[in-house]
Amino acid sequence: TTIGAFTVTGFAVDHSIFGCLAYLIEADGKSILYTGDIRLHGRKPGMAKRLIEVLSGRSVDVMLMEGTHFGFPDGNEVTEYELEDEIVDLVNQAPGLVLASFSPQHVDRLVAFIRSAKKTNRTFVADVYTAFILHMISSETPVPVPGKDELVRVYYPRTFEDSATRR
């Protein structure tokens, strides 16, 4: 994309928040790369590798890098796939209701819990906000959506129903 004298190129990056991008901004023979919160332990590490491939051999004048962590002190980094396997093991050990607290904007984590519920023959019950997130991103990426996937349901608190009927 060209904006005035600037050429801006976006690169999809594997991030816990859906739709994040790295940006290469070029003008007058100079370039700035903003990496976004780049990571290799998510569900799509190929995105970061592609960014590295595309930019290898190119000169970047300034790089702005964001990161929430740069590894684990003991070197035992857990991927989202490994975390999903651990969730499945824990859910299989639980005799009854399983509750989890995480941000539904962390789409990889949300997907891990939904997939874990399916693998353990349980129903994933989302709050209204989580259902909204799933609905919004379903047009961009294949995710289970309440109403279309029988193992994903939505919990509507009575106060939500009461306020909806008053309108």
Where are the language model's segments positioned?
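His/Asp/Glu-rich metal-coordinating catalytic cores
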Residues: 1-119, 123-129, 134, 140-147
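Acidic, Ser/Thr-rich peripheral helices and adjacent loops at domain boundaries
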Residues: 133-167
